[in-house]
């Protein structure tokens, strides 16, 4: 299946070879500003740039080391690039993303010839009928949507034992810094593709960690926006309370450009969150501010000078006392923290002051309760008969997986979905699995967590942001026992819908380690300033590019590394009786 998906794009690229023989060789790691300068001066065209990325994907993703990050190439990408070049030749440049190729996670709808499947054959068939708002915003800004990236199937929300970066449709994505290592998830392909220079920027989605963890694992900048800053319309959901769409990029500047273009600065009627505030601000009297149109104005190479940051080390020693964080990793984290003070920031120890950053205690109930409802609403946007779960429910998808277990469940099951389907249906119904807690009570717990900890610390300690390590370095991919998380900190901002920016901060045994800056809702300008200051002071990414080689293990838990990467060649044959009817 994946070979066929690439065939059309490869054939199209061959016809353009004569025109692309003089592609510049200095495009690896090139930034948006550099590429625009080259196109403005005539040194480069969008067609040549698009061809460069296609060639790189063919050589390093589908062949060679086999990163396996790109699910599908857009067969119209070169034609779109040519049209944008013609616009430029006539004097029209839509903005900083004009002619710039981008990749989108395979849960973000594009109303073109590409599938939007969330990595599952249950959503393969007729492509989505229209663009997601994010895709539409990118197209309007002149971006070339180059293709779709692989992901942890259903955004890592199907099994308690899932493997990050694996989907039935896409197989296993691998880490450019170590092909034996995991790219984290669920925006696995997005993070790996940005790191491997398969596009200028890529976009993923996050509910809790799915943008920032791949950023950490793959050594790129990852920007998780405030919930409602980017529209979720046309994005396969988990939770309307927590879902958000954001960029992976190789520099903070490119992430800032990407956010400027992708955001919904005005209300999007397809997503009510774009007109309101996230959970953490609800009931506080705080209102949605006017958001900047250009986030690059907040870039500052001295952005840490004079700033006050609250630091927390909660959880960094590991979730499991029997699998502590290795000493070299902790040493690298402390070295990364030291760079903050070296660059002029003052650190306030929030742990000593008694704040709690374990995450909202009601989060999991909120996620499983909303998923069943929200995914059915998404299925309703797919016309009857267009894909196996069109007009269906979570039960429809559950049944599809059982009928096609050979391709959908060769390594792990759907116990998380079974648990979700067992919940009581009402928002005020007590949930026995959660000690009688109701959905509405869980929402309030998460809201209070934000007020009493994140926002309280920011205000009382006069902080510019909160900072900590993002996640443990990438582990060896293990399709038998699943992911080997030691720690992760994204829950600090997940339940309440607050933003995070993750930036590369160090290397451990050849794989990246990052730190994350957290703030209250709509604090992206401050976070971008801080991250750009850290990036300028450390240059971790610039001095440590991916090697596409195997690496040295950093824990004694390795499991099974799959080499070459597991892939699937063809979709299952769907029996007519399994195609959902219009409900």
Positions of predicted regions on the chain:
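An N-terminal boundary/leader segment
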Residues: 2-83, 89, 316, 325, ...
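Gly/Ser-rich catalytic/binding loops embedded in alpha/beta enzyme cores
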Residues: 20-208, 226, 250-253, 262, ...
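Glycine-rich, small-residue loops and helix-cap segments
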Residues: 42, 99, 140, 199, ...
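Acyltransferase
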Residues: 50, 82, 294, 300, ...
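Short helix-loop capping/hinge segments that flank enzyme active sites or metal/cofactor-binding pockets
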Residues: 98-118, 298, 303-317, 368-452, ...
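Glycine/threonine-rich flexible loop motifs
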Residues: 118-125, 320-327, 475-483
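Flexible glycine/proline-rich, aromatic-decorated loop/lid segments
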Residues: 167, 211, 217-236, 502-506
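A short helix-breaking turn/cap at a secondary-structure junction
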Residues: 224-331, 354-357, 538-566
């Amino acid at each position: 299946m994946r070979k066929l998906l690439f065939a059309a794009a490869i054939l199209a690229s061959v016809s353009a070879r004569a025109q692309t023989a003089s592609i510049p060789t200095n495009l690896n790691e090139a930034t948006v500003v550099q590429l625009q300068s080259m196109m403005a001066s005539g040194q480069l065209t969008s067609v040549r740039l698009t061809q460069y990325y296609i060639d790189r994907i063919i050589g390093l993703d589908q062949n060679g080391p086999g990163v396996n990050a790109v699910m599908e190439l857009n067969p119209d990408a070169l034609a779109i690039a040519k049209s944008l070049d013609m616009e430029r030749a006539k004097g029209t440049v839509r903005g900083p993303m004009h002619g710039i190729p981008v990749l989108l996670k395979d849960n973000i709808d594009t109303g073109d010839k590409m599938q939007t499947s969330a990595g599952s054959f249950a959503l393969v068939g007729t492509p989505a009928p229209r663009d997601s708002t994010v895709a539409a915003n990118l197209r309007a800004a002149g971006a070339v949507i180059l293709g779709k990236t692989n992901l942890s199937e259903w955004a890592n929300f199907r099994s308690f034992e899932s493997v990050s970066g694996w989907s039935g449709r896409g197989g296993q994505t691998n880490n450019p810094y170590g092909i034996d290592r995991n790219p984290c998830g669920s925006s696995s392909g997005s993070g790996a593709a940005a790191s491997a220079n398969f596009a200028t920027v890529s976009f993923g989605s996050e509910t809790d960690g799915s943008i920032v963890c791949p950023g950490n694992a793959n050594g790129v900048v990852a920007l998780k926006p405030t919930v409602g800053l980017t529209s979720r319309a046309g994005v396969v959901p988990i939770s309307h309370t927590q879902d958000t769409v954001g960029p992976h990029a190789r520099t903070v500047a490119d992430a800032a450009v990407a956010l400027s273009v992708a955001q919904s600065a005005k209300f999007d009627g397809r997503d009510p969150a774009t007109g309101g505030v996230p959970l953490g601000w609800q009931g506080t009297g705080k209102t949605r501010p006017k958001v900047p149109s250009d986030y690059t104005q907040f870039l500052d190479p001295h952005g840490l000078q004079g700033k006050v940051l609250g630091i927390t080390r909660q959880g960094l020693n590991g979730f499991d006392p029997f699998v502590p964080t290795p000493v070299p990793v902790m040493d690298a984290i402390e070295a990364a923290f030291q760079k903050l003070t070296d660059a002029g920031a003052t650190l306030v120890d929030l742990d000593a002051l008694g704040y709690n950053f374990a995450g909202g205690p009601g989060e999991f109930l909120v996620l499983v309760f909303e998923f069943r409802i929200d995914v059915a609403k998404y299925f309703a946007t797919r016309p009857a008969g267009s894909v196996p779960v069109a007009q269906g429910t979570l039960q429809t998808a559950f049944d599809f997986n059982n009928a096609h277990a050979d391709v959908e469940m060769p390594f792990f099951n759907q116990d998380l979905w079974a648990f979700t389907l067992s919940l009581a249906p009402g928002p005020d119904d007590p949930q026995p699995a959660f000690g009688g807690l109701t959905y509405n009570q869980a929402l309030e717990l998460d809201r209070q967590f934000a007020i009493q900890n994140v926002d309280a610390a920011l205000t009382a300690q006069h902080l510019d942001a909160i900072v900590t390590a993002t996640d443990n370095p990438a582990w060896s991919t293990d399709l038998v026992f699943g992911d080997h998380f030691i720690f992760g900190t994204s829950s600090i901002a997940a339940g309440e819908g607050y933003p995070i920016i993750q930036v590369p901060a160090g290397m451990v045994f050849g794989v990246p380690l990052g730190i994350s800056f957290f703030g209250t809702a709509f604090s992206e300008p401050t976070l971008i300033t801080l991250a750009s200051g850290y990036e300028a002071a450390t240059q971790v990414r610039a001095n440590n590019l991916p090697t596409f080689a195997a690496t040295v293990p950093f824990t004694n838990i390795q499991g099974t590394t799959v080499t070459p990467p597991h892939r699937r060649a063809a979709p299952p044959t769907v029996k007519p009786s399994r195609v959902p009817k219009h409900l």
